[in-house]
């Protein structure tokens, strides 16, 4: 479930919006008090395409939120849990991933200042926009690896530090699960300059 993915991300230091899991209508008031309005009601179901199915809704006040929650709980999709999550004001998106270079047997950090894109298409049409940094597996991730990636993406100052922290968290996740690919597409940057993961699968 999405809420479990986000808990795992937070444990590795990856930033996610404030959220409260509710299992019934009686838990909504407490969640709204903690998260505030506007907020997003996200049905926790093990299927993709939740947005298109109408299972993710933005609500602006308690009255409309409760009516929406009731509709979601009573829907045909067998919704038993809702993640009540703060709504964020998005300014831009960036792309981050970590994978293994099978030829050199090194870990590759990949970043692009344009997120929400198909990275394979961008690699074919505009490869200069993609920044790649290789990390020796035995050596591990160093500060200069992270700096080379963020500077290469044109990120500096506080935002560069935040994205650098996300890269470190993603690297920890990648190594902890012995993964072949760890990807954030997109990492959202809010209008007040905060990096944030909004979506996880499912």
Please report, for each region that a protein language model flagged, where it lies by residue.
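Conserved protein kinase catalytic/activation segment
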Residues: 194-195
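A long amphipathic alpha-helix within ATP-dependent nucleotide-binding catalytic cores
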Residues: 145-187
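Conserved small/polar residues in nucleotide/adenosyl-binding loops
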Residues: 199-202
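Glycine-rich phosphate-binding loop of ATP-grasp-fold ATP-dependent ligases
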Residues: 16-19, 41-68, 95, 117-119
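Flexible glycine-/small-residue-enriched beta->alpha junction loops
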Residues: 99-149
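Preference for protein termini
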Residues: 1-26, 33, 37-38
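ATP-grasp fold ATP-binding core
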Residues: 3-9, 35-51, 77-91, 96, ...
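Catalytic core of tubulin tyrosine ligase-like
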Residues: 71-75
């Amino acid at each position: 479930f999405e809420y479990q993915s986000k808990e795992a991300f937070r444990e590795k230091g990856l930033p996610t919006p404030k959220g409260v899991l509710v299992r019934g209508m009686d838990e909504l008031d407490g969640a709204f008090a903690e998260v505030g309005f506007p907020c997003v009601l996200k049905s926790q179901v093990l299927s993709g395409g939740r947005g298109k199915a109408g299972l993710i809704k933005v609500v602006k006040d308690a009255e409309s939120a409760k009516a929406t929650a009731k509709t979601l709980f009573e829907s045909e999709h067998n919704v038993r849990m809702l993640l009540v999550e703060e709504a964020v004001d998005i300014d831009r998106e960036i792309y981050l991933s970590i994978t293994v270079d099978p030829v050199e047997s090194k870990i590759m950090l990949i970043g692009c200042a344009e997120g929400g894109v198909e990275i394979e298409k961008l690699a074919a049409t505009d490869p200069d926009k993609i920044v790649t940094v290789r990390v020796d597996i035995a050596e591990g991730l160093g500060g200069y690896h992270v700096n080379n990636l963020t500077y290469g993406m044109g990120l500096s100052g506080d935002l560069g530090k935040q994205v650098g922290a996300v890269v470190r968290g993603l690297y920890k996740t990648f190594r902890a699960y012995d993964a072949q690919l760890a990807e954030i597409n997109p990492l959202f940057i809010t209008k007040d300059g905060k990096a944030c993961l909004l979506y996880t699968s499912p």
